């Protein structure tokens, strides 16, 4: 206590002596005086004397700081302008670039410029997002962190706006090593209002093309096929002119359920093989297989021959050229009409690492090869996803042309529709 009082008296006397100094000299000395007492440690040096102050020791860089410096910057994900194309040397340098803190395992963390996208910003995008929240609907666009959400939801001069609705909740019973959707053995029960809510939302948006997909529901006896078919029928009732693509699971190999969905009134039946056969056990859930996916696509075409069938493959997982050729031949052998190629992008550190960032010219090459093999249409590029710009003008025109040619077979369509309704209701087909 005495020590504190002594310090205060010293400070007061020092302040009094300052008043006799010229104004220009006061601030520096006052600051030094106050600093000498603004500490809880003893300070035995004279007032204003800082010559004995120990030098500041610089803290070593932390592991966290190293990780931040090695990781991708914000500009690696978003770009407001179109990048100039890279020459082959620059592309190879990016492909082989390894970064990371010294003394640790290095990996590719910076994205090539062809994987940059614009920030979503359009009135259509905002309207769709608000309606989704209000009707408690999910989209694979958001759940799977798709980079094309701005293009699809906003539309373009070449194609109508599209959206991919994810049915049956946001929790999957499978755990594929490339997918960021939540997984659980016991997901929540189905929402009985979802078919009506989905149809209501789509009738508001004025979309030209919609993709319906779903999580896998191995906990349900029918895998959710009846729920899927009911949703398609509700949409067609409220918006008969909208084109509907269904990207389905494999229904645990139950081909009767595949036929049920194929006859529900959809325009495109899609089921993804995801990767080549050799990599399937390492990429997809153990309950899925390349051959089972082929059987699903074949059954859909058999149930409704005029139906467009579609599948998708990811590149950059370590597949070889020979394996890709084999996959395309197998798909053409069962008359798959449309195939898409896209770059695999690792959603989180818990998922499979990217083996390679495939150059855009390689995607162009595989598009040419697919079309030469007889595929009706092929979308191929680093940012292409299975439902990316599904409303492409070419597919829309093909579907509308087929719709006009088939307009005369009304009785056949009515009979099929009635049979599907009975199956959805749990009745036996007559």
Swiss-Prot record:
EC main group: transferase
Domain Radical SAM core stretches: 155-376
Alphabetical list of Pfam families matching this protein: LIAS_N, Radical_SAM
PROSITE patterns: RADICAL_SAM
Cofactor: how and how many bound: Binds 2 [4Fe-4S] clusters per subunit. One cluster is coordinated with 3 cysteines and an exchangeable S-adenosyl-L-methionine.
Binding site for [4Fe-4S] cluster 2: 172, 176, 179
UniProt-listed Enzyme Commission number(s): 2.8.1.8
Region entry Disordered, spans: 39-58
Keyword S-adenosyl-L-methionine: yes
Main localization of the protein described in the UniProt heading: mitochondrion
GO terms for cellular component: mitochondrion
Positions with a binding annotation for [4Fe-4S] cluster 1: 141, 146, 152, 387
Domain of life: Eukaryota
Compartments where found: Mitochondrion
UniProt keyword terms in alphabetical order: 4Fe-4S, Iron, Iron-sulfur, Metal-binding, Mitochondrion, S-adenosyl-L-methionine, Transferase, Transit peptide
One annotated GO molecular function: lipoate synthase activity
Span of chain positions assigned to the transit peptide in the UniProt entry: 1-37
Pathway: Protein modification; protein lipoylation via endogenous pathway; protein N(6)-(lipoyl)lysine from octanoyl-[acyl-carrier-protein]: step 2/2
Keyword hit for Iron-sulfur: yes
Cofactor annotation: [4Fe-4S] cluster
Sequence ranges of Polar residues compositional bias: 39-55
Reaction(s) this enzyme catalyzes, per UniProt: [[Fe-S] cluster scaffold protein carrying a second [4Fe-4S](2+) cluster] + N(6)-octanoyl-L-lysyl-[protein] + 2 oxidized [2Fe-2S]-[ferredoxin] + 2 S-adenosyl-L-methionine + 4 H(+) = [[Fe-S] cluster scaffold protein] + N(6)-[(R)-dihydrolipoyl]-L-lysyl-[protein] + 4 Fe(3+) + 2 hydrogen sulfide + 2 5'-deoxyadenosine + 2 L-methionine + 2 reduced [2Fe-2S]-[ferredoxin]
Entry similarity comment: Belongs to the radical SAM superfamily. Lipoyl synthase family.
Protein name from the UniProt record: Lipoyl synthase, mitochondrial
């Amino acid at each position: 206590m005495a020590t504190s009082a002594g310090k205060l008296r010293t400070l007061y006397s020092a302040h009094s002596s300052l008043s006799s100094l010229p104004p220009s000299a006061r601030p520096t000395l006052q600051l030094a005086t106050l600093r000498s007492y603004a500490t809880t440690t003893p300070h035995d040096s004279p007032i204003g004397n800082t010559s004995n102050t120990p030098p500041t020791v610089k803290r070593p860089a932390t592991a966290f700081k190293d990780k931040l410096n090695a990781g991708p910057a914000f500009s690696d994900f978003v770009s407001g302008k179109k990048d100039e194309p890279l020459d082959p040397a620059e592309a190879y340098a990016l492909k082989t670039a390894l970064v990371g803190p010294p003394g640790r395992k290095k990996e590719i963390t910076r994205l090539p410029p062809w994987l940059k996208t614009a920030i979503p910003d359009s009135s259509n995008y905002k309207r769709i997002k608000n309606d989704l929240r209000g009707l408690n609907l999910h989209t694979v666009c958001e759940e799977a962190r798709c980079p094309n959400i701005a293009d699809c939801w906003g539309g373009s001069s070449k194609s109508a706006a599209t959206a991919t609705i994810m049915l049956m909740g946001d929790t999957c019973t499978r755990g594929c090593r490339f997918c960021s959707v939540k997984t659980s053995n016991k997901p929540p029960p189905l929402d009985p209002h979802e078919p009506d809510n989905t149809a209501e939302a789509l009738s508001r948006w004025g979309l030209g093309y919609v993709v319906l997909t779903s999580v896998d529901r191995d906990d349900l006896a029918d895998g959710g096929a009846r729920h899927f078919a009911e949703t398609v029928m509700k949409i067609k009732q409220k918006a008969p002119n909208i084109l509907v693509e269904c990207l389905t699971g494999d229904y645990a190999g139950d081909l009767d359920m595949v036929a049920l969905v194929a006859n529900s009134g959809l325009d495109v039946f899609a089921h993804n093989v995801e990767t080549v056969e050799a990599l399937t056990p390492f990429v997809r859930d153990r309950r899925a297989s390349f051959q089972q996916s082929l059987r699903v696509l074949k059954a859909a075409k058999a149930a409704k021959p005029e139906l467009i069938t579609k599948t998708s493959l990811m590149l950059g997982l370590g597949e070889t050229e020979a394996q890709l050729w084999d996959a395309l031949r197998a798909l053409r052998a069962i008359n798959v009409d449309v195939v898409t190629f896209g770059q695999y992008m690792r959603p989180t550190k818990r998922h499979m690492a990217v083996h390679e960032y495939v150059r855009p010219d390689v995607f162009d090459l595989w598009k040419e090869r697919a079309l030469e093999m007889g595929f009706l249409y092929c979308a191929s590029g680093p940012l292409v996803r299975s439902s990316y710009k599904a409303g492409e003008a070419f597919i829309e025109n093909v579907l509308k042309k087929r719709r006009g040619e088939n307009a005369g077979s009304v009785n056949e369509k009515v009979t099929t529709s009635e049979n599907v309704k009975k199956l959805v209701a749990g009745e036996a087909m007559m």
